[in-house]
Amino acid sequence: YLAMVGAPIASVTGLEAIYWNPAGVDLSLASANALFSHRTYLADMSMNYAAVSGKVGDLGSIGLSFRSLNIGDINVTTMDQPDGTGQIISPGYFVLGLTYSKQLTDKVSIGANFNLINETIDKVASSGFSFDFGVSYKNLFDVEGLALGVVVKNLGGTMKFSGNGLFVQANDQSSQRGPTYLAIDGAS
């Protein structure tokens, strides 16, 4: 076997293709697939992934996927309280995806993902959409086993964060106005 970095983009088939190249979802030999994964990392981090797909006759295959990352609990520290404020935050993100895939010929298949993305950290959150498009070509130049895959991932708008966590309280001791809240522009 000859492979290069990112080789799964050309060779993956079935449900695993939702992540690598959605064009491979319709190449599954089964009419329906399901997958669940839970991984635990260092420092209480965990990644969850679940997906299902099924063939819809001659129309191709559709799939639904969900992946989430839980960063774990983080003790909040500040310049004034470097040992912790007693507050705990739990950042995380999730992606909910809808997939369509179709084998056009015995060699060519196409696929697309439509993803809803949500990220949160403390009092700040962001949501957005992204698209993935892929093409898979099997037996390139009529060479058995030689495949070419092309995928464009994460096409979408800029994620813009919002929430109370983007404001900081500034106390000017010489002012009689009281506390002032300033927006943090660098966080968007």
What role is predicted for each listed range?
Residues 1-12, 32, 39, 47, ...:
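Outer-membrane beta-barrel porins/channels
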Residues 16-27:
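N-terminal periplasmic accessory domains that precede
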